Every structure is written in structure tokens, then in C-alpha cells.
């Protein structure tokens, strides 16, 4: 029996992302690529994809990339710049790449694209919490 890669194990347990139809396409050390189709339920009052869903896609790619090294890693912060609108039916691909890791921290950039067009640019800052993927969090004292 083989053990799932840390990014695969984390994504398999991510009900929020999987329930939106997000798919993990590829992953490797410090990188991940995910895909999501914008549904009618993801469109806001302006007729464009709600920024929260675009952020969620980018954040999920970030999570897969920063958890690819093994220890459980969480977001310490993130910023997003929306470059172009997405619409119902658009297929978005988020590619996350590690820029640097230092100590228990890291910096990751994620580009969200519709084909060749950039929809959003995301920068995430990560922090390793030091437990293995799948371990239960320690209860606070």
C-alpha cells in the first residue's frame, strides 16, 4: 500500500474545495495546479464570478503547494489582485509556485488564468505548524 502525497492527502480531506468541483491537476515540491469551472451559483450581482470563489481557488492551490513538503502548513496571510472578470462557464486554472521557504515560513505566488488570460494574482504567506498531515491538532490548554 502506498501513502498519498501530502498535497493529495490534504486535498482529499478538503470538503469545501472538492464540493465546488475543484480538481487537483498536478503537484510537486512547492507547486500545484488546480482547475475550477465557474458555475451560475458563483456569479455575483454584477454578473461576474464572485471574488471569494476566485480567492478560494487560488488559496486551495496555495494550500496544496505549501503542504507538498509534508508538515501541516497553514496560511499566515494572503493578498489577491483581481485583473479581469470571470463568468459562468469559464474554466479557471490556478498554478501555485513556491518563491521561498525560511524556517517555518514560506511565500507562494498563484496565478489564476482563463486560458492564457490572467484573471487574478495571489500571494500567500505560509506557516508550518509542525505536525504531520492527518494528525489531529493539539488541544489548547
Where do the model's predicted regions map?
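Beta-strand residues in well-ordered beta-sheet regions across diverse protein folds
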Residues: 35-37, 95, 109
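Hydrophobic beta-strand-centered segment that forms part of the acyl-chain substrate-binding groove
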Residues: 63-93, 98
Amino acid at each position: 500500500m502506498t501513502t498519498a502525497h501530502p498535497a493529495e492527502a490534504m486535498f482529499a480531506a478538503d470538503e469545501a474545495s472538492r464540493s465546488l468541483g475543484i480538481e487537483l491537476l498536478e503537484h510537486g515540491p512547492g507547486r500545484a495546479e488546480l482547475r475550477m469551472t465557474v458555475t451560475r451559483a458563483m456569479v455575483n450581482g454584477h454578473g461576474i464570478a464572485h471574488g471569494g470563489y476566485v480567492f478560494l481557488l487560488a488559496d486551495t492551490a496555495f494550500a496544496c503547494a505549501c503542504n507538498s513538503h509534508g508538515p501541516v502548513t497553514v496560511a499566515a496571510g494572503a493578498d489577491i489582485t483581481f485583473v479581469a472578470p470571470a463568468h459562468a462557464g469559464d474554466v479557471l486554472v490556478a498554478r501555485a509556485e513556491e518563491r521561498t521557504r525560511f524556517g517555518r515560513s514560506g511565500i507562494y505566488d498563484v496565478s489564476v488564468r482563463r486560458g492564457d488570460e490572467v484573471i487574478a494574482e495571489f500571494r500567500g504567506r505560509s506557516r508550518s505548524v509542525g505536525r504531520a498531515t492527518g494528525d489531529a491538532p493539539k488541544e489548547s490548554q
